[in-house]
Amino acid sequence: FGEVWIAGGQSNMEWTLAKAAEAADWAKKEHTGKVRFFVSVDSGSDTPQDDAAGYWLTAVSWDAAQLCSAIGYMFAYNLSDTLGIPVGIVNTAQGGSRFCTWIGQDTTAANPDFADYVTAQVQPRADDGTWDALHRFYNSRIHPMRGYQAAGILWYQGETDIERGNGDVLRRGIPLLVRDWSTVFGDGENLLPFLSVQIASFSYRNDYLQGTGYTGGLNGTAVPNGNFLMNQGVEEINRAYGKALSVPIYDVE
């Protein structure tokens, strides 16, 4: 027996353990196969799919572990060690993906204000083509797993939206995504634990953030089972620029 967590977002979540700053330390650890990954690979879909494309990784050695999501593997490894059970990660993340691609049709239909906001404010700033289409990766990577029971959700996404001045989509949308995915992977009544990493705002010009709602939006009321980890990389900024100031992005209770 064991438990499975769903990992989602963009390239931050895809970033492999081999590229992590602590890779050398993790290479020395014992990798016993108690951490297992399913990694989604597809280009999205305009319509909901029944089957998911991907591949399996069982971390029986460093050679396998280093190919896994750094965040996902570290989380699963430590959780497995604490609970004494195998832990699986379904990594659905896609580099460069926008938030609106991860929401399902039923959710946008039930929340027309959010759908109207995406149509009016988000889609006009999207790249040409279908990569940024509403529901795109939900259709191909989340919908096929409906009914599968998961223990919780790991989330790391936001750069693509912030870079295009759409930070408010996160404030508006994350509570909807938590309920959406909790319906897919939970019991249909209770919200799953939702663990999210805030993006490091020092990477973006101030005018990307001003007026977006990104800097003030989420709190414990909006996401009752949510836990938002601030990632400002202060030590790294200090090394690069000589000084840094850490300011919370979200006001989390």
Show which residues each predicted segment covers:
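Cell-envelope and extracellular/periplasmic
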Residues: 1-253
